[in-house]
Amino acid sequence: MLLVKMTTHIFNADDLLQALQQAKAEKNFSSVFSLDWNKLRTAKRNTSVKYVTVYVIIKGKKAPLMFNFQNEKHVGTIPPSTDEEVIRMNAENPKFLVKKRDRDPCLQFNKYKISPPLEDDGLTVKKNEQGEEIYPGDEEKSKLFQIIELLEEAFEDAVQKGPETMKTKHVIKLIQRKISNSAAKNADKPLPNPIARIRIKINSGTNILTPILLNKSKPITLQNGKTSFEELKDEDGVKANPDNIHKLIESHSIHDGIINARSICISNMGISFPLCLEMGVVKVFEKNNGIDVDSIYSSDDISTLVNQIAIA
């Protein structure tokens, strides 16, 4: 159970998904999703960067977009922030060499909760007798991924309906569907299980993680009788921070949380729609035998995409 005091409305994931699905079916995303082009805000650290507020309307409620999610599986490795950790991790797993992280960490979520059946190359999706690629059923689709996929469409639609000066700008995708064409291996090949990312922001002034992170395996009872969880800490009792986050959030951990998607960002790189973790609850989950994204693309590929989606 997430306990958080906010004046901003937090939309329910089921309600948001249903509203976006209906809007897509009716070819009318503007009935749910809109951008307030009349009130551009300037970034404090970089005056060339502008922000536009994202609004959604669900069940008669209009508010800047924040929404919750539950039971979503993070995949892949968060790169470390120190040289010492790079050396340690590469010694432990020489098959996947990491580089030092120079940007905010991200949670990564696949389209499907389980991997599609793959050929021996670990990348090509197997086909049935009719020559059709075999993918998991709808019940195996990540709800969070479905929401982000629809938000991507709604975002692009809103930009095209916005000011003329915005229509020619590069719109940065929320979903990674292909391996980067600059990757060391498998360049530009389709990912069998596309990836969406949620940014874990770091306060540049204090070097502290912006979101509150809790440990679902350590529930506590508050004075009012409600249940919450202890803050996420490492084995030495140190709270989650930029230097230990890669140890605390491992591949296949399960996450609940709140996503801040209240603004799009306009910069010289184009128009992006940053999705940032506002609050998260982490539960370590037993690893399965499915393919890990780390085995099919490099850390450079991750950094390239994070640089695009996390301009702000």
Swiss-Prot record:
Alphabetical keyword list: Early protein, Virion
UniProt-annotated location(s): Virion
Induction of synthesis: Expressed in the early phase of the viral replicative cycle.
Chief subcellular location: virion
GO CC annotation, single: virion component
Protein family (similarity comment): Belongs to the asfivirus CP312R family.
Protein name as it appears in the record: Uncharacterized protein CP312R
Source organism of this protein record: African swine fever virus (isolate Warthog/Namibia/Wart80/1980)
Taxonomy of the source species: Viruses, Varidnaviria, Bamfordvirae, Nucleocytoviricota, Pokkesviricetes
